[in-house]
Every structure is written in C-alpha cells, then in structure tokens.
Amino acid sequence: MLQQQESPIPRLGVGEEGVVGRHVFGEVWGVNDKLLQDDEYLKNLVIKAAEVANMHLVDVKVWRFGGGDKGGVSVIALVLESHIAIHTWPAYNYATIDVYTCGEHSRPWDAYDYIIKQLNPKTFTKTIVDRSSK
C-alpha cells in the first residue's frame, strides 16, 4: 500500500502565476546494446539524473521485457516533481527518454542532457515543451 508523503517543497509545481510544468523528451539511436540491457546501470543513471536536475527522488522501478539477450528495459523514477523514464530496445540500439517536472526549482533539461551524455548515442532528438498553466 502506498503511503502519502508530505512534500518538503511548499506548493510544489505552483508558482505565483500558476502551475509551472517543463517537459523534455526524445529518442536516442546508436547506443551500445549492452548499456540498454543493463537494468542496474539504467537505474543508477536515472537516480543520478534526478540529482543533477535538483529533483527529489521518491522511488525507482525497473522492468525487463522481451526476454533473451536482446530484451528491453523500462526504468521509471518517481520524483516529487513528476518523473524520469527510459524505455530501451537493445535489438535496435534505440531508447526513448522522458523527463517531466513541475515547479521552478528543478532543471529537467539538465537531467536529459546528463542521460544523453552517459548513453553516448550516435544521434538523438530533444524536445522541450512548456506545460505551464500560464
């Protein structure tokens, strides 16, 4: 059973002008398939990315899919500000990355850039969307 936790950040995600939401997401190609299969590496990657971006980690969950030596991994970090997610397809050297935060104190683009640097893809996309209520 999940227990509700009080946020250490007053009015998380709500600024003077309304809700502040920032969404950074994209895709990576040409990543080493061994990295994309390494669930422990990916788990630690999102934990460090949350720290780099000034997010407050609540929990991290990891799932393996597809079996065999080319099965994918999904890692989702729940942070007080929202989430970080990585979904991998090692057989295609491909992954998707999603970082969403609420509030003005966190820097989702820093988390995204950190993940990109560590995965070292041959190519990637990066989309930044303002999801604020302003």
UniProtKB/Swiss-Prot annotation:
GO terms for molecular function: adenosylmethionine decarboxylase activity; arginine decarboxylase activity. It catalyses: L-arginine + H(+) = agmatine + CO2. Binds 1 pyruvoyl group covalently per subunit. This is Arginine decarboxylase proenzyme. The modification Pyruvic acid (Ser) is found at S82. Its EC number is 4.1.1.19. Heterooctamer of four alpha and four beta chains arranged as a tetramer of alpha/beta heterodimers. The active site is at S82 (schiff-base intermediate with substrate), H87 (proton acceptor), C102 (proton donor). It is an enzyme of class 4 (lyase). Is synthesized initially as an inactive proenzyme. Formation of the active enzyme involves a self-maturation process in which the active site pyruvoyl group is generated from an internal serine residue via an autocatalytic post-translational modification. Two non-identical subunits are generated from the proenzyme in this reaction, and the pyruvate is formed at the N-terminus of the alpha chain, which is derived from the carboxyl end of the proenzyme. The record marks E81, S82 as: Cleavage (non-hydrolytic). It comes from the Archaea. Keywords: Autocatalytic cleavage, Decarboxylase, Lyase, Polyamine biosynthesis, Pyruvate, Schiff base, Zymogen. Its cofactor is pyruvate. One of its GO terms (cellular component) is cytosol. Pathway: Amine and polyamine biosynthesis; agmatine biosynthesis; agmatine from L-arginine: step 1/1. Specifically catalyzes the decarboxylation of L-arginine to agmatine. Has no S-adenosylmethionine decarboxylase (AdoMetDC) activity. GO terms for biological process: arginine catabolic process; spermidine biosynthetic process. SUPFAM superfamilies: S-adenosylmethionine decarboxylase. Belongs to the prokaryotic AdoMetDC family. Type 1 subfamily.
